[in-house]
Design a protein with these regions (language model features):
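Gly/Trp-centered helix-boundary motif
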Residues: 1-155, 159, 163-164, 289, ...
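Alpha-helical transmembrane segments of integral membrane proteins
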Residues: 125-341
Length: 341
């Protein structure tokens, strides 16, 4: 931390002083890393196979059944008892902790779907026979990636729009405010429902639609910061010296505005994850079969006789959002100079 400026060192000290937010950041980082490595934790393929003095990495490469002594050239099914016996007789395999992928079905269970937690399925199976824990891992990754990308794109658009309005003011600011007022009044959910009847919704399609109608969150903050700083003496001096508007905006004014927007980012990320979860719960989100926390919540509602579905999905969403809220509160305290360490 010695490389940080005194101001940033004080901010970091205030952030660490908020123990709840500080440890929430570490827990969130661990959960994020685990979700990014979902294939190494939950997969229906082994990590490494040693078969007849040859090495195979099924988690990275697709092999055929004939590679393991089978009669067909179709992709190997590593859950097939025959193939597992072949590997056991002529070599060995290293498996991941959870031997089910996002769309794997446990055909070996003796109970109807959704089946309760067991030694094979630690959190049980869903209504389609998928492992709940595996789908939570993959669903968390999709939710986090969606939330991060939505936060990034919408923040960039909001910062640019707010900077232009705040710097130039006048008619540009007036017309910009009126456009934002009209645009923010659009019924986003109904538009998504309408478009879902025309095209098949997907990850990038949903991301584009939500960015299109969700970029206004930071406009007001950035606009107010630019309206405040554009009258400073050093800004007027730069204008008098002939410095270009772009250089003034991005080099001299934007760093001050970014500080004000950083405190909002964890809450925007929280809202982005909630948006995808809500759309999936309503049936207008990711394609059918995609691992999703919202879809798992919907299954919990439709299968009240299987409480592990709703409980697991609810706790996953609640923990994720709570961590982000705690982090956001700590970031807000860190950038508040009136907070004592």
């Amino acid at each position: 931390m010695s490389r940080l400026s005194p101001v940033n060192q004080a901010r970091w000290a205030r952030f660490r002083h908020n123990r709840r937010g500080y440890w929430s950041l570490w827990i969130f980082a661990v959960l994020f890393a685990l979700s990014m490595c979902s294939e190494l934790i939950a997969n229906d393929k082994p990590l490494l196979v040693h078969f007849k003095d040859r090495w195979y990495v099924p988690v990275l490469t697709t092999y055929s059944e004939s590679d393991f002594g089978g009669p067909f050239a179709t992709p190997a099914e590593y859950q097939d008892p025959w193939l597992r016996e072949q590997i056991a007789q002529h070599g060995w395999a290293i498996w991941v902790p959870i031997r089910f992928g996002a769309n794997s079905i446990n055909f070996a269970t003796s109970t109807p779907f959704p089946s309760p937690p067991s030694a094979q399925n630690w959190l049980g199976t869903d209504a389609n026979g998928g492992d709940v824990l595996a789908r939570i891992l993959y669903g968390t990754r999709i939710s986090l990636l969606f939330g991060l990308m939505l936060t990034l794109f919408s923040s960039v658009m909001g910062v640019v729009a707010g900077a232009v309005q705040g710097y130039y003011g006048g008619k540009i600011d007036l017309w910009g405010q009126r456009v934002i007022e009209v645009w923010s009044g659009m019924p986003t959910l109904f538009l998504i429902i309408l478009l879902s009847s025309v095209v098949q919704p997907g990850f990038w399609w949903l991301l584009g639609i939500t960015v299109l109608f969700g970029w206004m969150a930071l406009v007001g903050v950035v606009r107010a910061e630019f309206l405040r700083t554009r009258n400073y003496d050093y800004i007027r001096a730069a204008q008098a010296l002939g410095v270009s508007d772009g250089a003034i905006i991005f080099r001299h004014m934007l760093p001050n505005a970014v500080v004000a927007t950083l405190t909002f980012l964890p809450f925007i990320l929280c809202s982005s994850i909630t948006t995808l979860t809500s759309l999936d719960f309503l049936g207008f989100g990711l394609p059918l079969g995609s691992p999703s926390l919202g879809e798992l919540l919907l299954q919990g509602k439709n299968n009240l006789q299987a409480p592990w579905l709703g409980i697991a999905a609810f706790l996953s969403v609640a923990v994720l959002l709570s961590l982000l809220i705690f982090i956001g509160e700590a970031v807000r305290d860190a950038f508040d100079p009136n907070k004592a360490v």
